[in-house]
Structures are given as C-alpha cells and as structure tokens.
Amino acid sequence: MSNINQMPREEGIDSTWRLMEEGYMYILNRRHSFNSDIFETRLLGKKAICMGGKEAAEIFYDTEKFKRKDAAPNRVVQTLFGKNGVQALDGQTHKHRKEMFMSIMSPDELEKLTDITKKQWEIAVDKWEQMDKVILYEEAKEIMCRTACQWAGVPVQENEVKRLTKNLGAMFESAAAVGLKHWLGRHARNYEEIWIEELIDRVRDGKVNPPENTTLHKFSWYRDLEGNLLDTETAAVEVINILRPIVAIAIFINFIALALHHYPEEKEKLKSGDKKYSQMFVQEVRRFYPFFPFVVALVKKDFTWKGYKFEEGTLTLLDLYGTNHDPEIWKNPDVFSPDRFAKWEGSPFSFIPQGGGDYFMGHRCAGEWVTIEVMKVSLDYLTNRMDYEVPDQDLSFSMASMPSIPHSKVVIKNVKKRI
C-alpha cells in the first residue's frame, strides 16, 4: 500500500509567464487556491515544486535534502549573483566561504558601519536642503553605495560614485527582467567585476592597502579549503556580494518612507527614540513590504516529505513573501503592525524576508544584520533628524515587478535638517 500523496499540480505546459505576470503573489495565490502549502508546476520548461510556510522553510534549508549549485537560472547568475559566488555553493566549501562573510559581521564592524551610515546621511541631508525635490530611491542608492564602499575598504573616486551606484543597482533591478533591461544588468555586472578584479590584483601586488578588517582586504587574501587564494574573478564576485546587497537596502529605505507616510501614528511613536520600537518597526517593514519573492534550490537526492515525493534534481522554490504573509504564522498578516514583534521569538524559518536557516551553517543571508542596522539609522534620520514634505505622487507599487518599489520612487521636498 503506497503512502505517497498526489501533489497538487498546476495545469498548463509551462507557467513561467504566469510567474512573471504575478510576481510576488504567484506562489501565494496557488497556495490559497490549492489550499496547500506545496504544489507542482512547470517553470522554464522543467518540472518545479513550489512551497511556503514555516515547515516548508525548515525542510528547504536542510542541506541533506537540497543543494544550491546550478539551481539559479543562468540569467539571474549573470545579473544578480555572479558566477561561483557563495549562494551557489554547498557542503564544506559553502561553510568555509560563508565564514569569510561572517568574519566581517562582528559587533565592532557593524558599529563602524552604523557610524559611516550616519555620516553619509548627514552629507546627503545637507545636499537635499539645496534641492527643489529629492527622489529618495535614487538618493538612497547613492548613500548606500558610498557607505558600502567606505565600510568594505573599496577606494572609489568621486567621479566614479554615480557609475558604481547605477551599475550596482542595475544588478538587482534587472534580475527578473527580460530584453534590454536584462542586458544592461549583465553589462553593469561585467564592467564592475573587471573594475574590482583590477583592484584585487593591486591589493595583492601591494599597490593598494585596505584596512585589515575590511571586505576588500579579507576577500583578497582569503584561502579556500586547499589553501589557495581565490581566483580574482571569484574574489571580485564576492566583494560585489557585499556591495550590491547594501545598495539594495535603498528599497527598504523607500518602504520606510512609505510606511511613515501611510501610518503617521507610527511616526509619532518613533519620535520618542525608543530603540526597541525602532527595531520592531524596521522588522515589520521587512516583513510587510516585498523584497525577495522566493529562493530556489535543487533536490539533492530522492526523499519523501509529508507523503510527497521529491525527486533528485527537481527545481524547488520557497515562497519568502508568502511565508511572511502566512496567516498560520502571522495574525492579520496584511495589516502593518510593528507591535507584532514585541514578543517575537526570532524563528529562523517563519520570518524570512532575505531567506531562512542558520547564518553560519546554512544559506541565511549573511548581510541581514547589516540590513537591520542600516535601516535603523535611516529610520532615525527620516523620523527625528530632518523635516520634509511628501507631495502628491503615485506611491503605489506593483506586486508583479521584482524588485518592487513605489512608482514615484518616493519624492520628497522642502528638506530641512533639524538642529
């Protein structure tokens, strides 16, 4: 007698176009319609399994059952991740490389990052006071680019900042794009990888000497399990894997501004300077608004879970956005409520805006701590250190666009620094 259950299956030859059309809601919509946290479909011409929820996240991050190597579509590798980056590694190789990333996330280094972020916000607000209007998303990307480079020990000239900001942004803005936007994203990555490769060569030749605790120094001199230096191409990819995600925090900064505008009562609460409430607000922004839609892996070997058969090599998608809006996990998930984090216990599988699992042993985003600290500084500036007006504009955002940002990119005007 068989114990294998029939997995709910989406009809159709291929559903890639539906995923592109529905974006963040694709998996969640079908979880609702099938009344199931797991279903089968076809994506990019191949069988795929989509799943969401806390239990699904727990099994997805089981490294005995899933692997990351060769899971991401090539067009995403060519724009977002780069080749041979930490996201595509498994086993001891992944663990060793991940330790390189975690080595720059010490409390002291995060404090340095916080100080740098504050200084860059100060400079930006001074500039904004002289501007008729500020397109916050574009300006936030530049703040984040300057912050990332200074913290990572990457020397960048003033006349290079605009180019680098634009190109780092293009890498994550084009990850789900087709046509010209995709090719612009690929060109942006190729250009900056070559630029960083040349910089790493100069570090190794002794011509550039970044501080020892910085990304550029550590990644330039990192040795793999065999004791070899990373080839310059891979080292450059990993340096960009620090810079690019910090620039992407501009998306969250945009949503912070949107939340402050839509929920003015929250802004009043934040003016008290309560650090705990600031943390709760930041976490709710990360939960409530769209960032990563899903993550992908391949089934490592045949196994059965909840009566469903997973066959080796099957592409599997974990619903990040949907898990953060799962009513089984979150009460009133479509209501913006920072208070829900007052007694939150910090599960690594129920709250997964940037992925789940363990920081050191698993594939949870190493930069999550960076994101939270930078967001708290940004929230403080938008709440307590400057005044501004939000003129009429289109603040809606599309759940089909990946990544999603408000259509107007949040325009503010009449910026005044508080004394």
Swiss-Prot record:
BP terms from Gene Ontology: fatty acid metabolic process
Tagged with keyword Lipid metabolism: yes
UniProt GO MF annotations: heme binding; iron ion binding; monooxygenase activity; oxidoreductase activity, acting on paired donors, with incorporation or reduction of molecular oxygen; peroxidase activity
Binding site for heme: Y61, R68, H94, K98, C365
Required cofactor names: heme b
UniProt-listed Enzyme Commission number(s): 1.11.2.4
Pfam families documented for this protein: p450 (PF00067)
Entry binding sites for substrate: R244
Catalytic activity: a 1,2-saturated fatty acid + H2O2 = a 2-hydroxy fatty acid + H2O; a 2,3-saturated fatty acid + H2O2 = a 3-hydroxy fatty acid + H2O; dodecanoate + H2O2 = 2-hydroxydodecanoate + H2O; 2-hydroxydodecanoate + H2O2 = 2,3-dihydroxydodecanoate + H2O
InterPro entries: Cyt_P450 (IPR001128), Cyt_P450_E_grp-I (IPR002401), Cyt_P450_sf (IPR036396), Cytochrome_P450_3A (IPR050705)
Keyword Metal-binding: yes
Key words, A-Z: Fatty acid metabolism, Heme, Iron, Lipid metabolism, Metal-binding, Oxidoreductase, Peroxidase
Family statement drawn from the similarity comment of this UniProt entry: Belongs to the cytochrome P450 family.
Subunit structure: Monomer.
Purpose of the protein: Fatty-acid peroxygenase that catalyzes the hydroxylation of dodecanoate with formation of 2-hydroxydodecanoate and only trace amounts of 3-hydroxydodecanoate. Cannot use hexadecanoate as substrate, and from tetradecanoate, forms only a small amount of the 2-hydroxylated form, with large amounts of substrate remaining. Can further convert 2-hydroxydodecanoate into 2,3-dihydroxydodecanoate and 2-hydroxydodec-2-enoate, the latter product likely leads to undec-1-en-1-ol via oxidative decarboxylation.
PANTHER family: CYTOCHROME P450 FAMILY 3, FATTY-ACID PEROXYGENASE
Protein name: Fatty-acid peroxygenase
